[in-house]
Each structure stands twice: as C-alpha cells, then as structure tokens.
Curated annotation (Swiss-Prot):
Pfam families: AAA, AAA_2
SUPFAM superfamilies, sorted: P-loop containing nucleoside triphosphate hydrolases (SSF52540)
Annotated ATP binding sites: 18, 60-65, 247, 312, 384
GO cellular component: HslUV protease complex
Record-linked HAMAP family: HslU
GO molecular function: ATP binding; ATP hydrolysis activity; peptidase activity; proteasome-activating activity
GO annotation, biological process: protein unfolding; proteolysis involved in protein catabolic process
Function description: ATPase subunit of a proteasome-like degradation complex; this subunit has chaperone activity. The binding of ATP and its subsequent hydrolysis by HslU are essential for unfolding of protein substrates subsequently hydrolyzed by HslV. HslU recognizes the N-terminal part of its protein substrates and unfolds these before they are guided to HslV for hydrolysis.
Identification of the protein by name: ATP-dependent protease ATPase subunit HslU
Assembly behavior: A double ring-shaped homohexamer of HslV is capped on each side by a ring-shaped HslU homohexamer. The assembly of the HslU/HslV complex is dependent on binding of ATP.
Length: 434
C-alpha cells in the first residue's frame, strides 16, 4: 500500500470526484489509520480496529465512487455488494458470510495478477519456445529456430495456424452447490478434487500464433508462480487491507411503524453484526478473520433513518458522513473537471471514428441546467442524469459517426436546446426518456 497522507489521498480523489469533501476526509483518515496501525507496537496492533463508516446521501452523488477510487489507491482487495442480496441464515439465499468468500476470491485474483507480472519475462520466453516447437518441431536445428524466432518477433507469423496443447481447465462438475445454500458452500469444490485426482489433463487446440500468444504466456506464468503462496498472501491482504462497500444498507433497516417479520431486514442486520465486529469465516481457501476489514456502508435513507438500524449495528458504524446533493455548479464541474470527465469520454469515443467533437461553454452550461431541472422536477438521480442527457444529445452524431470520418462537430447551446430542450421541459416525456 502506498503511504499517502490524508491530504494526498484527498488530492488524489479530487482528480476523479467533484465535491463531497467530508466523505473524502473520512475515507482518507480510515486508510491512513491502516498504515498507522501497522507502525504500532505488536501488543497494541491487534487491539486497534478500523472505524467503519456510514455514508448517507441520495443516489448519484459519489458514495460508491469514493470507495472504489479509495480501493484502487490503496491497491487493496475491494468488494461492492448490495445489502438487499442477502437473507438471514437458515433461509434460502445467500448469507452474509459470502461477502468474505467473494472478497477472498477477489484478493486471490489480484495477487495472482501481481505474481504473473513478476514472472512475465520468463513466461514470455517459455511461451516463445513452445510456439517455436509447434512451428518447426522440438528437434529442429538451432539455426532454423533462430530464423523462425526472428520472424515470430517481427510478427510475420501472426496469421500462421499451429496445433498447441493447453491445460484443460473445463470441468462440468466445477462447483457443488448444496440445496438452499445459494452458492455459499463454495468451499466444497469438486473441480479442485477431481483435477488433482486425474492429474493435469490437456487438450489440443488449433489456433493462430497471434491468438495463442496471450493464453500461452498466462499458462506459463501460472506454472512459475506458487499457488499456495498466492492464497496465503491473498488471505493476509484481506485480513489486513480488505475493504467492503455495503450499499443499500437503508433497505434492510426495519422501520418502527411497520410490523411483522421480515427475513431480509432485521435478520440480515443481526448476521452482519459479528462480521463487522470481527469473526472468523470459513472459505475454501482457509479461515479468514474479519477483525481488520474496513466496512463502508451507504444508503440514501429517504424512507428509513439511520436510527432505524439496530442499535448494535449503529454502534459498529461509528463514523457518519452526510454527502450533499449535487448543485448545478457541481453538475457542471462533473462534466469537465475529473480526469475522465464525461465530456472527455465522449470526445475519445468519437475520436475512434476519426470525428472531432467539441463542446462550447454555453452548451455545457445548458446541459448542467437541464440535469438540475429534471432532477428537481422528477427524481433526483444525481450525476447519472448527465449521462442520460448526453446520450440523448449525441444520439444522431453517434449513429452517423462511421460515415462522418474527418468531420468536426461543435455542440452549442442552441443544439442542446434543439435536441433535448423540448424533452427536459415536458415533465411527462422526461419521466420516460430522461
């Protein structure tokens, strides 16, 4: 993990997300506290637990994006899940421990990619030798191999077909799901058992040199890395640096004025308590402790209130951050300021067709005005409204772009009014189109 200060973390988040400084500060401090804990004396380290966060704010204001960018910044195992997908233990469906199992699998994939990158050169060399064996035979003279090696590296043989043996990873009995468990018993993996019992099976594939190159490098890299070490490091990464973003937490808050049992509400909250507090979860990779996993819960809380959550769950989410609804100025900044702003994305998409797309300042102002107006009059979906309006605005240009190579399109305020103005002004049409 990079040892960034909270100020540096906020500055990095500012490159991608507009506003929401309170949320950025909260996650920046939480991330820095991980590094601080690792510097603490050994006898204190186990006692310092992460201060989990509850983000409160309407949809489309940046709750998910803050967490996603934070995970990329920390290079940490990250999982985003909706709280509504889980049911109480004992009922048909996924139980909350599946969160940890999925997080471990995400970490294994992340660590494996890092290990593959470390042996990339050796894997490429071995893949090249296998391709040469397929092209000229393993018994060919070294001079012949060198001639073909030069041609291979120059790309002259890319379209030539070769027969290669690849490890057979397909298994019709890959996973045993027990009835009613919703895949949560994934530690019982028949594919692993049968694969070890039958040894490494291979299958012969006829393919071109170009198409074979990448899977060959991946296969050779997997032979060079230690799978057990990957699993050990993945479990450690989850236990020390894992981040879980628990969205729609407000949807499992049981409101006081509603009676009756509801398996997807209070029961799920009770199941979440030990997970967030710290417990040990069995996975097919081994036991995983959740004591130091950072949980970031979020919800709009339009109907329910944070106080409708179980008191014990509220206590396990001590940091409360309220995200502000987006203003017209925020919407305008979202269009132009982030490193991968929506305007830049659409310009890049059109550039692929050799079409130059430019937006006048007046057009950007009109788009922001319309987004704010529709959000206020119909349903506030935050920054996502900008995408809806831009798609509608650029519909004709996107459709005709392949036939307009070399041309330049300038989006003006009048063009925005012409394409979207009538829809934005008509509340009934906006409900269905914008």
């Amino acid at each position: 993990m990079k040892h960034l200060t909270p100020r540096e973390i906020v500055a990095e988040l500012d490159r991608h997300i507009v506003g929401q400084n309170a949320a950025k500060r909260a996650v920046a401090i939480a991330l820095r506290n991980r590094w601080r804990r690792k510097q603490a004396p050994e006898n204190l380290r186990g006692e310092i637990t992460p201060k989990n966060i509850l983000m409160i704010g309407p949809t489309g204001v940046g709750k998910t994006e803050v967490s996603r960018r934070l995970a990329r910044l920390a290079n940490a195992p990250f999982l985003k899940v909706e709280a509504t997908k889980f049911t109480e233990v004992g009922y048909v469906g996924r139980d909350v421990e599946q969160i940890v199992r999925d997080l471990v699998e995400a970490a294994v994939g992340m660590i494996r990619e890092q290990k593959r990158a470390g042996v990339d050169k050796a894997a490429r060399d071995k893949a090249e030798e296998r391709l040469l064996d397929a092209l000229v035979g393993a018994e060919a003279q070294s001079s012949t191999r060198e001639v073909f090696r030069r041609k291979l590296r120059a790309g002259e043989l890319d379209d030539k077909e070769v027969d290669l043996d690849f490890a057979d990873t397909n298994n019709p009995m890959q996973m045993l799901d027990l009835p009613g468990q919703g895949g949560s018993m994934s530690m019982i993996n028949l594919g692993d058992m049968l694969g070890k019992a039958m040894g490494g099976r291979t299958r012969r594939v006829r393919t071109t040199v170009r198409e074979a190159a990448k899977p060959l490098v991946t296969e050779e890299a997997d032979k060079l890395v230690d799978e057990e070490q990957i699993v050990r490091e993945a479990i450690m990464a989850v236990e020390e640096d894992g981040i879980v973003f628990l969205d729609e937490i407000d949807k499992i808050a049981a409101r006081k004025d509603r009676g009756g049992a509801d398996v997807s509400r209070e029961g799920v909250q009770r199941d979440l308590l030990p997970l967030i507090e710290g417990t040990t979860v069995s996975t097919k990779r081994g036991a995983v402790k959740t004591d130091h996993i950072l949980f970031i819960a979020s919800g709009a809380f339009h109907v329910a209130k944070p106080s409708d959550l179980l008191p014990e769950l509220q206590g396990r989410l001590p940091i409360r951050v309220e995200l502000e609804p987006l203003t017209r100025d925020d919407l305008r900044r979202i269009l132009v300021e982030p490193q991968a702003s929506l305007i830049r994305q659409y310009e890049a998409l059109m550039a692929a067709e050799n079409v130059t797309l430019t937006f006048e300042d007046g057009a950007i102002d009109r788009i922001a005005d319309m987004a704010e107006a529709v959000n206020k009059s119909i349903e506030n979906i935050g920054a996502r409204r900008l995408q809806t309006i831009l798609e509608r605005l650029l519909d004709d240009i996107s459709f005709d772009a392949p036939d307009k190579g070399g041309e330049t399109f300038t989006i003006t305020a009048s063009y925005v009014d012409e394409k979207v103005g009538s829809l934005a002004g008509n509340a009934d049409l906006s409900k269905f189109i914008l």
